[in-house]
């Protein structure tokens, strides 16, 4: 009987070995399929990583562009503010210039009596104070008389023949003074030019 049991156990063990081999073959067959599935997942994940990296790079680029635009806008705003402050008194100065012209005309009048002299002295003081106030704000008269004609700051209203020691294209008479604020012409000088 012991022999029969031994045969039975060997017979039962033999199918177990066959089952083990079959299971191993199934597992071996499943492994490439599992590896193929994992490879696909890895490829998908790598693709997602690449897409997300590209999106991140695009966002970084957009962010840098937005920051640069903001910096440019800030610089432009500051420059415009500086220009506004620099030329702040332009309109007021243009309104005052005719008053200054009238004061100059009043000073050109010849007076002989004491009252006229006192009045002229007062006009001269007002004129001087007004010119000083304009100069304090960088509003200056254009130097034109006996200077070469400059079309950027002067306007020729008449030409005359050059005489004596006058050079051609030289201002021989100023009819109305011109003024500049910093580098901007408020009013060109009205001049007569020798030809």
UniProtKB/Swiss-Prot annotation:
Residues 1-60 are annotated as: Disordered. Its main location: cytoplasm. Belongs to the GrpE family. GO terms for cellular component: cytoplasm. InterPro entries: GrpE, GrpE_coiled_coil, GrpE_head. The keyword Cytoplasm applies. It is found in: Cytoplasm. Keywords: Chaperone, Cytoplasm, Stress response. One of its GO terms (biological process) is protein folding. GO terms for molecular function: adenyl-nucleotide exchange factor activity; protein homodimerization activity; protein-folding chaperone binding; unfolded protein binding. It comes from Limosilactobacillus fermentum (strain NBRC 3956 / LMG 18251) (Lactobacillus fermentum). Homodimer. Residues 37-60 have a biased composition (Basic and acidic residues). This is Protein GrpE. Participates actively in the response to hyperosmotic and heat shock by preventing the aggregation of stress-denatured proteins, in association with DnaK and GrpE. It is the nucleotide exchange factor for DnaK and may function as a thermosensor. Unfolded proteins bind initially to DnaJ; upon interaction with the DnaJ-bound protein, DnaK hydrolyzes its bound ATP, resulting in the formation of a stable complex. GrpE releases ADP from DnaK; ATP binding to DnaK triggers the release of the substrate protein, thus completing the reaction cycle.
């Amino acid at each position: 009987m012991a022999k029969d049991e031994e045969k039975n156990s060997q017979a039962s063990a033999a199918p177990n070995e066959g089952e083990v081999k079959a299971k191993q073959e199934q597992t071996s067959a499943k492994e490439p399929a599992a590896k193929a599935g994992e490879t696909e997942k890895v490829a998908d994940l790598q693709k997602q990583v690449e897409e997300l990296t590209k999106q991140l790079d695009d966002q970084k680029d957009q962010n840098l562009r937005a920051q640069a635009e903001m910096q440019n806008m800030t610089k432009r705003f500051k420059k415009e503010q500086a220009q506004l402050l620099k030329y702040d008194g332009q309109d007021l100065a243009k309104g005052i210039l005719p008053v200054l012209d009238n004061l100059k005309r009043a000073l050109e009048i010849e007076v002989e009596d004491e009252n006229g002299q006192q009045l002229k002295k007062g006009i001269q003081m007002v004129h001087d104070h007004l010119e000083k106030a304009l100069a304090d704000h960088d509003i200056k008269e254009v130097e034109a008389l006996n200077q070469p004609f400059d079309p950027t700051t002067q306007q020729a209203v008449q030409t005359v023949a050059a005489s004596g020691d006058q050079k051609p294209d030289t201002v021989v008479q100023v009819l109305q003074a011109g003024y500049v604020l910093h580098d901007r012409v408020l009013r060109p000088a009205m001049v007569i030019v020798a030809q």
